[in-house]
Amino acid sequence: VVAPAGVALRSQPSTTGQRLALLPESTAVSLIQTVQGDPYDALGGSQRNDWQQVKAGELEGFVAALWLEPGGPGEQEESSRPREMRGVWICSHHHSQVWQSREALARALDELVELGWNTIFPAVWNQSFTAWPSAVMERHGLPKQDPVHAAAGIDPLQLAVELGKERGLTVIPWLEYGFAAEPVGASRGLLAAKPAWAALDRRGQVVEDGGLRWLNGLDPEVQAFLGELVLEVVERYGVDGVQGDDHMAIPHAGSHDQATLERYRKATGKRPAARDDDPSWSRFRIEGLSGWVKEMGVRIHRVRPDLLWCLSPCPLPTGLTQLMQDSTGWLNNGSVDLLLPQLYRNSVAAYRLVLEGNLRPLARERRRQVVAGLTLRANGQNLEEATLLEMVRISREAGLGGVALFHHTPLMGGDQRIARALLSQRG
């Protein structure tokens, strides 16, 4: 038989038995016998008590029978199928306790692996700070590392890579803030040190959008800075890729600094647009962001061709009209390897609608490069288990490459009911 998801090999047929090993996804094991043991959670809130005594390499122990599937003659065909991504965003220390210690992160990753998750997106760029000690930040006269992590003497990115790889996880650092600088009201953020990098609106004020103050993502110096951070991550750490959030964006009210307006005049021969939704002005900014996205893909793949350049944009049409994100264009022309649109909806009908709208402009062969971004809470409402499971089913039916859930803290909190239910829906 084959373990299709990460499962614990235990010394006894019990969830309290000593954990001998964590078997990564698709581990081949030899069945010795089926035994009755302590009960464990199964599907639909029920329980089972059937365990398999198995041999995995030189180790022998017990695995809950629920998490095994037949192998045999069809095993080679099964293993050749593209692996479904089952990802989880792990927020920064502002919203997650896993960064308190090496042991806390190890426990969190053990739980994820045991429940069948195979990819993590640890937050590493937030509120003007990097989680890792950054030579790029230091070179620009900025704090070398988030002071919380610096005081603790830890490098969360190195820990995530080291502990994640030990457990067979795909590790894709998440540069959450992108071209956003800091929350509105922050007293000593990035813009205090680099005021010339600010995105300006028509009144010459710093753009505030979504509760954040923004950098000018069309400023060549700002683009170079963020690009340097991305490359520092992929060059220094053994990651599987790097991911930008919906904040890899140009807010529609921004880009009114004189240098950007002058570049617009030279490129189009037109005066500054009277409206922020002017088609020519919007197209200029969309192309400016898309050019940076494409360039970063080229530079990342020069470091290592197998690295994944991933973006998690706001879904269409809002992402395009309000944030200048031509996300389906990025995927269709090969600028990115993976798209994780944030399809955060609180009903199945709304989810189906937004998914269809975002798949329609895509070439059908690109669908495996789309991973549905789902959330446990949308529009102020917690999602019901049945709703989330149906969204996962719809995503698979559409031929997507997997799902990613926002975020780790609510997923793994409490009784982990939803996390276990989602495991039962694995592809």
Where are these regions (language model features)?
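Aromatic-lined carbohydrate-binding/catalytic grooves of carbohydrate-active enzymes
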Residues: L115-A152
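Catalytic domains of carbohydrate-active enzymes, especially glycoside hydrolases
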Residues: E103-T130, R236-D240, S335-L338, A398-G402
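Polysaccharide-binding and catalytic clefts of secreted carbohydrate-active enzymes
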Residues: K194-G329, N333
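Beta-loop motif signature
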Residues: V2-N49
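Active-site-adjacent "subsite" loops/lids of carbohydrate-active enzymes
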Residues: S80-R102, I172-R236
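Substrate-binding cleft of secreted/luminal carbohydrate-active enzymes
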Residues: S335-L353, N358-P361, E365-G427
